[in-house]
Structures are given as C-alpha cells and as structure tokens.
C-alpha cells in the first residue's frame, strides 16, 4: 500500500483537460461557468481599496483562482471594520470576492481553468513567442549579410566609376565638363603626336621605300602616302591633304554649340513653315468670306497655281534647299566642315594613318627578325645590289624604330583617345558617356542607402527581440507556477501521490 502511494501520476499536458473531465474532477460545461466568473471579476475589480499588492495582482496578468484567494486575504485586513459578531462581513467588496471564490470551487472550475491556461501557454503562447524571437534573429543575420553585400557592392561600383574615369582621363567631379575640356585639348594632343611622327618616321619610311623599290620595283609615291605627307607637312588639315594647297581660312566646327545650333535651325525652319501655311490659310479664308478684298491678293489669284498659299509653300521649300546646299559648300581656299579638321581628327584619314603605321611596324618587326638570324650566302648576294640605307641597317636600329611605331600606335589607339574621337564625331556621345559613368555612381549611392536601410532594419529586429525576450521569460515563469499549482492540487485529490505533467518542455 505504501508503494502504491509513491507511484507517480503522469499526465500528458495536451490531454490534461480530457483527463480532468474523464475522471469527473470538473464538469463538461465549465466554459460557460468560467465566462460568468470572468464577468464578476471584471465588475469586482472596479471597486478595490488602495493597496500596492492588490494593484500589482490586478495589473497585466490573468487573474485566476489563487489570485482571488490572495485578494480575499488582503481584503480581510482592509475590511476588518465591517465584520460582525457572527464572523461575517457586511462589505460588498468581501461579498463579491467570496461569491467569485465559491463559483470557482463549484465543480472544481478553478482547476480546469488553470489547466486550460497551462495548455494554451504550452501549445500556443510560448511557441509563438519563441518563433517570433527566432524570426528576429534570422532577420538580423539576413540584414547583416545584405549590409555586407551592399557595402561591398557600393565600394565596387565606386571603384568601377573612378577606374572608368581614370580610363577617360578625368577625375569624375564634373564628368561632362571634364570630357568637353579634354575634347578641346584633343587638337593640341594630336598636334604633338603629329610632330612626334614627323620627327621620328623619316628613316623608317625611307627604309620601307627603299625595300619596296628594291624588291618590288614599285614607285615610291605608292608607298605610305599618308605617312609621307605627315612626315613632310605634319598634322595638317584634311583640306590640304585633299587639295594639296594650304587653306587661307579654317572654320573649325564648335563642339558644344553644334547640338544647340541644329536645334535652333530646326525650330527656325519650323516657324517659317508655320508662317507660310498660316498666310496661305488666311488668304483662303479671305477668298471665301463674302468676296471681301483684303488688298493683298485678288480673289481670282487663289485659283492660280502660281499664287496665294501654294506659291508660298513652293518658295519655302526652294529656300530650304538653297540654305542646305549653301551649308555644304565653301568658297575657294576656305576649309569648312570635315575639311577643317586635321588628319588625325578626321576618322577616315586617321584610320588610313593608323593602317600605314601598322603596315610599317609589321615590316620593320619582320626585318628585325631577319637581321637577328644568321645570313646565308643567298641573302648576302641579294643585298649586295641593295641601296646603302638597307645595307647599313642593324638589328638595334630596326628594333628602335619598331618601338617608336608601337608607341605612336598605342597613343592613337588608347581607350581615352577612342572615346574622345567618338565625342568629336558625335557630340551626343558625351551625354551617353556621362550617363554611363553617372549610372555607376548612382548605383553606388543607392547601395550605400540600402546599406543604411539594412542597418536600420537590423536595429529594429534587435529591438523587437529585446522586447519579446522579457515577455517570454515572464510567460515561462507564470507557466511553471501554473504547472506547480495544478500538480499540487491534483496530488491532494490522490492522497499526496506525486503528479507529473508531461510534455511541457519548460
């Protein structure tokens, strides 16, 4: 018998309510009785004496049976003056709380209510808070990862921006202005390149001419015409290259004014056309308006193909064609349009110049290889009749000339000059380059802003976690207290046998 008293009673928490109902510790209709009790508690707490402990019991927690017992004990002290000789209290406060306790003890309603609170906390409230805290921790990790990605991305885009600016030869403070300034300096850079070519290409051209003339018996004027011209006259204008005479006047195009000038011309021609059409329309109205004579054109002229609005339209078209033709023509000795550009500025002549440089560079590179090899009897006999300039060439001289040519080709084909040439050929290209570079900087700024947003969201998630953790700790404490109260109450009903509520995981 004693061994039986020490056998514990194990109850699954999820089935605690069913266990109490099955063993008739409480009624099936306990929920309706609990609702009545809650209404009476809500009414009773409206009239309570001033007590710090009572206020603490009533603030922020679910009031259950054991709270009511404690409140009743406190009221016995505050309402002692209302106690009569029979040991009863005339105070309405005492009567209200005594009634609440009596309702709780009816059919053990307090026990099933406590069990319901325990099951709800274990199955729903505690897992929900833990899930929210885990979500906050996950968000913090995700926001931290995104913060690092945004920081790295912003630094990379900023580095790409400055690297691209370095390739263009600008600092990036004012992209458009710096590019236009470089384009303005482009003629002087090309003039220096032309001067360097003029000074350094003489011997190389002579060697190539002599070699072609010796091997192919080709006329010297057919060899590298552009390089020969630059070697004699430098980086002159296209007009001088095309005509052979130096222009008396050079009218260079203005880069910045070109798009605005085109837009203004288009607007002017549009206004002229509108005026012409409006005048023709006015004349047509005057001709139809009851024969009114405006003193400008006779009414009969409106039917003549050479008069009124039709004549004005033809004149407008003829005038437009005349102006366009005048824009493409230039007087004798005046370099205008592409003719006003230098050989290295104009695309076609610059490409020809580069082609001839590469042709000369390939020839000299091959010649340097031949000079580095041991000469056989056949080659020696062949070059006995060659010009003196060919016989006097050495490997060192040839390699030096190749190095000079490679340097010139590298300058003219550099990425910076390529973009400047494109801007020179199409002024709108500077806007495209500016937009391209600014886009990298904007992306860097957007990533920096996104990084700040990730920091803010990470802080918000941290604050939310800090607010949830005390709630979870308090709920765990209250749930453990409920578990102990329920286990102790059930143990009393079974002669003090130990009771274990299983599955709480607290």
Curated annotation (Swiss-Prot):
<dbReference type="GO" id="GO:0071569">
    <property type="term" value="P:protein ufmylation"/>
</dbReference>
<dbReference type="Pfam" id="PF05600">
    <property type="entry name" value="CDK5RAP3"/>
</dbReference>
<dbReference type="GO" id="GO:0042177">
    <property type="term" value="P:negative regulation of protein catabolic process"/>
</dbReference>
<feature type="short sequence motif" description="Shuffled ATG8-binding motif 2">
    <location>
        <begin position="292"/>
        <end position="295"/>
    </location>
</feature>
<keyword id="KW-0206">Cytoskeleton</keyword>
<feature type="cross-link" description="Glycyl lysine isopeptide (Lys-Gly) (interchain with G-Cter in SUMO2)">
    <location>
        <position position="450"/>
    </location>
</feature>
<dbReference type="GO" id="GO:0043407">
    <property type="term" value="P:negative regulation of MAP kinase activity"/>
</dbReference>
<feature type="region of interest" description="RPL10a-binding domain (RBD)">
    <location>
        <begin position="355"/>
        <end position="370"/>
    </location>
</feature>
<dbReference type="GO" id="GO:0044818">
    <property type="term" value="P:mitotic G2/M transition checkpoint"/>
</dbReference>
<dbReference type="GO" id="GO:0032790">
    <property type="term" value="P:ribosome disassembly"/>
</dbReference>
<dbReference type="GO" id="GO:0032088">
    <property type="term" value="P:negative regulation of NF-kappaB transcription factor activity"/>
</dbReference>
<dbReference type="GO" id="GO:0030262">
    <property type="term" value="P:apoptotic nuclear changes"/>
</dbReference>
<dbReference type="GO" id="GO:0140501">
    <property type="term" value="P:positive regulation of reticulophagy"/>
</dbReference>
<feature type="short sequence motif" description="Shuffled ATG8-binding motif 1">
    <location>
        <begin position="267"/>
        <end position="270"/>
    </location>
</feature>
<dbReference type="GO" id="GO:0044387">
    <property type="term" value="P:negative regulation of protein kinase activity by regulation of protein phosphorylation"/>
</dbReference>
<dbReference type="GO" id="GO:0010921">
    <property type="term" value="P:regulation of phosphatase activity"/>
</dbReference>
<dbReference type="GO" id="GO:0005813">
    <property type="term" value="C:centrosome"/>
</dbReference>
<keyword id="KW-0472">Membrane</keyword>
<dbReference type="GO" id="GO:0007095">
    <property type="term" value="P:mitotic G2 DNA damage checkpoint signaling"/>
</dbReference>
<dbReference type="GO" id="GO:0060318">
    <property type="term" value="P:definitive erythrocyte differentiation"/>
</dbReference>
<keyword id="KW-0256">Endoplasmic reticulum</keyword>
<comment type="subunit">
    <text>Substrate adapter component of the UFM1 ribosome E3 ligase (UREL) complex, composed of UFL1, DDRGK1 and CDK5RAP3. Interaction with UFL1 anchors CDK5RAP3 in the cytoplasm, preventing its translocation to the nucleus which allows expression of the CCND1 cyclin and progression of cells through the G1/S transition. Interacts with ATG8 family proteins MAP1LC3A, MAP1LC3B, GABARAP, GABARAPL1 and GABARAPL2. Interacts with CDK5R1; competes with CDK5RAP1 and CDK5RAP2. Interacts with RELA. Interacts with CHEK1; may negatively regulate CHEK1 and thereby stimulate entry into mitosis.</text>
</comment>
<dbReference type="GO" id="GO:0001889">
    <property type="term" value="P:liver development"/>
</dbReference>
<dbReference type="GO" id="GO:1900182">
    <property type="term" value="P:positive regulation of protein localization to nucleus"/>
</dbReference>
<dbReference type="GO" id="GO:0005634">
    <property type="term" value="C:nucleus"/>
</dbReference>
<dbReference type="GO" id="GO:1901798">
    <property type="term" value="P:positive regulation of signal transduction by p53 class mediator"/>
</dbReference>
<dbReference type="GO" id="GO:0008283">
    <property type="term" value="P:cell population proliferation"/>
</dbReference>
<dbReference type="GO" id="GO:0031398">
    <property type="term" value="P:positive regulation of protein ubiquitination"/>
</dbReference>
<comment type="function">
    <text>Substrate adapter of E3 ligase complexes mediating ufmylation, the covalent attachment of the ubiquitin-like modifier UFM1 to substrate proteins, and which is involved in various processes, such as ribosome recycling and reticulophagy (also called ER-phagy). As part of the UREL complex, plays a key role in ribosome recycling by promoting mono-ufmylation of RPL26/uL24 subunit of the 60S ribosome.</text>
</comment>
<dbReference type="GO" id="GO:0001933">
    <property type="term" value="P:negative regulation of protein phosphorylation"/>
</dbReference>
<comment type="similarity">
    <text>Belongs to the CDK5RAP3 family.</text>
</comment>
<dbReference type="GO" id="GO:0030968">
    <property type="term" value="P:endoplasmic reticulum unfolded protein response"/>
</dbReference>
<keyword id="KW-0832">Ubl conjugation</keyword>
<feature type="short sequence motif" description="Shuffled ATG8-binding motif 3">
    <location>
        <begin position="310"/>
        <end position="313"/>
    </location>
</feature>
<dbReference type="GO" id="GO:0071901">
    <property type="term" value="P:negative regulation of protein serine/threonine kinase activity"/>
</dbReference>
<dbReference type="GO" id="GO:0034976">
    <property type="term" value="P:response to endoplasmic reticulum stress"/>
</dbReference>
<keyword id="KW-0963">Cytoplasm</keyword>
<keyword id="KW-1017">Isopeptide bond</keyword>
<dbReference type="GO" id="GO:0005737">
    <property type="term" value="C:cytoplasm"/>
</dbReference>
<dbReference type="InterPro" id="IPR008491">
    <property type="entry name" value="CDK5RAP3"/>
</dbReference>
<dbReference type="GO" id="GO:1990756">
    <property type="term" value="F:ubiquitin-like ligase-substrate adaptor activity"/>
</dbReference>
<keyword id="KW-0539">Nucleus</keyword>
């Amino acid at each position: 018998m004693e061994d039986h008293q020490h056998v514990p009673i194990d109850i699954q928490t999820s089935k605690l309510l069913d266990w109490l109902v099955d063993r008739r510790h409480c009624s099936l209709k306990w929920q309706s009785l609990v609702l009545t009790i809650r209404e009476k508690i809500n009414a009773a707490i409206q009239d309570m004496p001033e007590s710090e402990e009572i206020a603490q019991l009533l603030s922020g927690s679910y009031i259950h049976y054991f709270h009511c017992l404690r409140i009743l004990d406190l009221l016995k002290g505050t309402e002692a003056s209302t106690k009569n000789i029979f040991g009863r209290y005339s105070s309405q406060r005492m009567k209200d709380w005594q009634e609440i306790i009596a309702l709780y003890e009816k059919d053990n309603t307090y026990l099933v209510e406590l069990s319901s609170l325990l099951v709800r906390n274990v199955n729903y409230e505690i897992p929900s808070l833990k899930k929210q805290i885990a979500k906050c921790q996950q968000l913090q990790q995700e926001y931290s990862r995104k913060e690092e990605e945004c920081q790295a991305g912003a630094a990379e885009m900023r580095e790409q921006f400055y690297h691209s600016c370095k390739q263009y030869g600008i600092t990036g403070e004012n992209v458009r202005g710096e590019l236009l300034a470089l384009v303005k300096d482009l003629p002087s850079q090309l003039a220096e390149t032309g001067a360097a070519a003029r000074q350094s290409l003489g011997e190389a051209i002579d060697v190539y001419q002599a070699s072609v003339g010796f091997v192919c018996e080709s006329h010297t004027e057919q060899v590298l015409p552009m390089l020969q011209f630059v070697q004699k006259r430098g980086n002159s204008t296209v007009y001088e290259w095309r005509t052979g005479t130096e222009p008396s006047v050079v009218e260079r195009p203005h880069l910045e004014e070109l798009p605005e000038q085109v837009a203004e011309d288009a607007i002017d021609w549009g206004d002229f056309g509108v005026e012409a059409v409006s005048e023709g329309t006015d004349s047509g109205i005057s001709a139809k308006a009851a024969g009114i004579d405006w003193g400008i054109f006779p009414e009969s002229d409106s039917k003549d193909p050479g008069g009124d609005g039709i004549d004005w339209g033809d004149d407008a078209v003829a005038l437009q064609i005349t102006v366009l033709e005048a824009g493409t023509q230039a007087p004798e000795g005046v370099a205008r349009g592409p003719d006003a550009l230098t050989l290295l500025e104009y695309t076609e002549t610059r490409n020809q110049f580069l082609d001839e440089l590469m042709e000369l560079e390939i020839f000299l590179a091959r010649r340097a290889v031949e000079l580095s090899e041991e000469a056989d009897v056949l080659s020696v006999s062949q070059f006995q009749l060659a010009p003196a300039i060919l016989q006097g060439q050495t490997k060192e001289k040839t390699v030096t000339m190749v190095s000079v040519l490679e340097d010139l080709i590298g300058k003219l084909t550099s990425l910076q000059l390529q973009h400047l040439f494109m801007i020179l050929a199409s002024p709108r290209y500077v806007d495209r380059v500016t937009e391209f570079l600014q886009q990298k900087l904007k992306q860097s700024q957007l990533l920096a802003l996104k990084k700040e947003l990730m920091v803010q969201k990470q802080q918000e998630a941290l604050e939310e976690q800090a607010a949830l953790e005390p709630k979870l700790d308090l709920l765990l404490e209250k749930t453990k207290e409920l578990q102990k109260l329920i286990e102790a109450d059930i143990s009393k009903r079974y002669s003090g046998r130990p009771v274990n509520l299983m599955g709480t995981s607290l």
